[in-house]
Amino acid sequence: MSRTKIAIAGALGRMGNNLINSALSNNNVELVGVFDVNDIDPSFINKNQIQENVFTTREESFEKADIVIDFTTPKALFNFTEAAVSNNTGLVIGTTGLDESHFNLLKQTSNSTKVFYAPNMSYG
């Protein structure tokens, strides 16, 4: 069985770091992308023991991943849904603070690709 290729949006945040650590210790997933609003510094890759072939841009991450896990901001969702549909990439949304326009967008996106919305996944 092949491993699920995942990318993490919001990699520089607390939940992003937790997801990276979980992905690196899970034999069922392959971490193919990490990206954030700000560029990912190479020292972040080394510090987190991420392989050098992991992509650090949104575009490459959506192209290579089966699923992108999003822990960024509601504003970013508009760009992510477009990239998910054009690359047939599934979306797991953990971002909080979405409004009706975001939910309508997610519903529309779910007609073209996989969407899972689960806010408030943080510890304690």
Regions picked out by a protein language model, each given a short descriptive name:
Residues 2-6:
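Extreme N-terminal starter segment of soluble prokaryotic enzymes
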Residues 25-47:
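NAD(P)-binding Rossmann-fold cofactor-contacting core
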Residues 31, 50-65:
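Short acidic low-complexity segments
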Residues 72-73, 96:
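Short glycine-/small-residue-rich Rossmann-like dinucleotide-binding loops
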Residues 90-92:
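A short hydrophobic/small-residue beta-strand
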